[in-house]
Curated annotation (Swiss-Prot):
Signal peptide: none annotated. Coiled coil: none annotated. Pathway: Antibiotic biosynthesis; butirosin biosynthesis. Keywords: Aminotransferase, Antibiotic biosynthesis, Pyridoxal phosphate, Transferase. 6'-oxoglucosaminyl:L-glutamate aminotransferase that catalyzes pyridoxal-5'-phosphate-mediated transamination for the conversion of paromamine to neamine in the biosynthetic pathway of butirosin. This is Neamine transaminase BtrB. InterPro entries: Aminotrans_3 (IPR005814), Aminotrans_3_PPA_site (IPR049704), PyrdxlP-dep_Trfase (IPR015424), PyrdxlP-dep_Trfase_major (IPR015421), PyrdxlP-dep_Trfase_small (IPR015422). It comes from Niallia circulans. The lineage of its organism: Bacteria, Bacillati, Bacillota, Bacilli, Bacillales. The keyword Ligase does not apply. PANTHER family: GLUTAMATE-1-SEMIALDEHYDE 2,1-AMINOMUTASE, GLUTAMATE-1-SEMIALDEHYDE 2,1-AMINOMUTASE 1, CHLOROPLASTIC-RELATED. It is an enzyme of class 2 (transferase). The keyword Thylakoid does not apply. GO terms for molecular function: pyridoxal phosphate binding; transaminase activity. The gene is btrB.
Amino acid sequence: MKQETVKSSEQLLSVLGTYIDSPVDPFRKERVMFSRGSGAYLFDYDGGNYIDLMNGKGSIILGHNDPSVNAALRNFLEQDREVVTGPSKPIIDLAERIKKDSALPDAKVSFYTTGTAACRAAVYAARDYSGKKIVLSSGYHGWDPMWRQQGPLLEPNEDGVIEFYFIPELLERALTAHKDQVALVIFSPDYTYLSASTMERILGICRAHGVLVCCDDVKQGYRHRQGSSLELVTTEKADMYVFSKGLSNGHRISCVVSSDEIMAETKEHTYTAYYQMLPILSSLETLKKMESGKGYDLIRSYGQTLTGNLKELFVQSSLPIEVNGSSIFQLVFGDEELEEAFYREAFIQGLILFEGDNQSLSLCMDKDVQVDLIRRFANVTDVLSEQFKHLRGKEVTTEQTFRTAWNMIDGASDLLPYEKQLKLLDNLIGGG
């Protein structure tokens, strides 16, 4: 990293109070700052180029600075149509589109700026509607302190939230222990480590106990299909949905969708920038492009091709590295030193990866980009194959995969039976 980038990073650290969640240059230990992005590529202030698999942690679904989205935004602004004082027609267009995609009867939509805010709003609405306090949760719902787990397993935190970690048996225990006290069960679906049968069991248990269910589709919604990803694996529907990352190609927007009765509890959820239209327009253009260009099918095929090539590459290297998933995928390592070296070398080769978490593809990752991707990954394995030749032939264990999956889904996976899951939970969270 050259002097200009280092200087910019130091300036950023001196003025921002929040954690800077961007890749680190392994030599200077400085955060990378980007000057621009185009399609699958990012560029730093010194001209270095990278292929981005972090993709704004999954919110860049078309590619950076998509020409269609940028043109729509420019045209809107040049016509002086941005009015924050009150609503404009595009907000109706987007709400009607999301309502239609949800297929919920009498649905209404409320908009927010982040997935964190929308998940919190869903909890508030469910509590106000039901008159109950307890919330049962699985998965990541944002940085809000309400989701922190501070006590023993299946004990509510100070905000009344209990984690069940995608384990149906724990969900059943929690619902039985807190009968008639549960306002909502909220979970973030996963399609890499959780089976369709597990998610159907979770929904079935909720229905048997008569509790409201919210599908936190911030990450998965509008990524695999129009609307909720849950319908990929079950005909069961949730009572509430939260969408965000798949909507707008990186612009700040999220929403809660539910029935008219439940959404009436969100009527006071307004804020200064509620009627800002640029995120709305970006969403409309993104959804139109994904649908008209068969974007969901293309990204799915890109994911299958890329992960297939990566699996072959790692087999050839004989190193303990696995690839799990497809258009959203995770790398799993059989050795901690190898993992650290892999991410370090990946950055050197111009790959932006979400370390320890999920990598995500965008619509612009066509054949040419994938050839470049595999070339860069091959450079990584070429370097590491010699450096870690003592690991050749070693395999990734099921427990290693379970622990790595935990970092991605914030919960237990189907890789181990219930009894073994509980033993690992005791180690991972201090359960009981």
